[in-house]
Every structure is written in C-alpha cells, then in structure tokens.
C-alpha cells in the first residue's frame, strides 16, 4: 500500500505534522501513521504512551479540532494511528490553511485560499457588494 489522498506514514512524531492533520481536516479526512517508514513498514515508536496523551492535546490546542488517536501493534512493534475526520469549516494551523491533495500537503494561498474559504463558508464572489467605486 502506498501513501495516498487519505494515508500518510511518518517514522516519528514532529509537531510540524499538525500541518498534515490540518490538511486532512480541510480535505476528505485521512489517517496518519506514526511509526511507519515511507514503504509502509512498521518500524515502531518508543514513546507510544506519551504520544497517545500529547498528540490529541496538541491537535485540540493548536487546531481546535478533535481527532482519534489509537495505539496499534504489529510484530511486537507499537505504532500510532491518527484518524482525522473532514471538517466543514476551514481549519487553520497558526493562520495558515493546508489541504491534502493526492499524496501531498499543500499550503493554500492567494486565489486558491480565497476560493477555499468562500466555498467552506457557503459564499460566492457575486454576493459581495463593493460600496465605493
């Protein structure tokens, strides 16, 4: 199995992966596995119990959303599954909006960001009135 629109593998946790969680939340949701290499092989994590506590709190505090964090085991190696549901409202990471596209995380900027926010808030450009010319 390869990384795809809804699956990302990381060998260990870094706080920057909150951007990936943000991207999944703004797209169709997905799962991040901590303790798996780029080939999808379980390599395990040594601090699984700490991650089970830290990750949900960091996601809540930084992104304002809730994700499921589960401890899994394969061949005696523990790894973490972070299950991110899609959110209908735009989710940002420190003022930046990320989006999962294919097997990549994209930061939305400019016209793409405007379009994304308008779509998520149910608005259209033609309903905005310019008051001065």
Regions found by a protein language model. Give the residues of each.
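Conserved N-terminal catalytic/coupling substructures associated with nucleotide/phosphate chemistry
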Residues: 1-133
């Amino acid at each position: 199995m390869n990384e795809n629109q809804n699956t990302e593998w990381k060998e260990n946790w870094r706080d920057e992966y909150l951007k990936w969680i943000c991207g999944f939340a703004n797209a169709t949701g997905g799962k991040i596995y901590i303790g798996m290499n780029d080939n999808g092989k379980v390599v395990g994590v040594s601090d699984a119990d700490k991650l089970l506590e830290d990750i949900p709190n960091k996601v809540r505090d930084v992104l304002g959303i809730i994700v499921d964090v589960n401890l899994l085991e394969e061949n005696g190696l523990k790894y973490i599954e972070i299950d991110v549901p899609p959110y209908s409202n735009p989710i940002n990471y420190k003022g930046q909006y990320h989006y999962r596209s294919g097997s990549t995380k994209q930061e939305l900027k400019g016209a793409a960001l405007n379009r994304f926010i308008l779509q998520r808030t149910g608005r259209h450009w033609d309903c905005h009135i310019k008051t001065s010319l």
